[in-house]
Amino acid sequence: HCITITQKNYPSTIQVGNICDLTKADFPSEIDLLVGGSPCQGFSLMGRQLNFDDSRSKLFFEYVRLWKSLKPKYFILENVKMRQDIQDAISAILGVQPIEINSALFSGQNRRRLYWTNIPKVAEKLTQTSGQLSLITGKSLLSDQTYEIATVRKGNPRQIVKPATDKLPCLTASYYKGINADGRPGKAKSFGDYERGKIEMLSPVECERMQTVPEGYTEGVAKTHRYNALGNGFTVDVIAFILSC
């Protein structure tokens, strides 16, 4: 589905296939930039913390394999905040320390991520400019200017509504499953408008705004897949900032 979204917006993109099957022979010319973000679930402090033992984490090593083989001029690897020892292990492999950037500096959501990159002066420029960037509120991203939240528990339903005057919580790939009362993705079962006592979800367009993706960028696939792609993706303006350094 992400390929469908990419080709709709950039039809000349060359899809080279599964990273596990790629070798240097698949890239006849030199590579200027290698960007990756291996699945974060294995590393996340919110998950089971299987780290390198999680089957999904193997794609990190596929990224490293290609990075060593292709020797790109620059690289960026993104992932979630994780245990310090795992973070240190990744840093030792890549030879650089990560830079923590919260998407709240560039958008209306709190999304703390680690970025390993050899692009120079990113940390220095972030320190110099971060105070000027956090101007976008969650409220400005929403169509109705209200962030309505509810959690529905069997036999004990309760609803909460609060204005979105600050940053929205982090968008994840599982967003479509629901939102808890504190704004974190959860497993609320009923969706609808607030007037009927149910939850109002952020629309795909509002989620695109959270990720600083152009409105309508993910159109053309089912709504579930739009949420999935946006939750798994980068905050565009964060990557743009890194590349501008």
Regions found by a protein language model. Name each.
Residues 1-245:
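Conserved active-site and SAM-binding loop architecture
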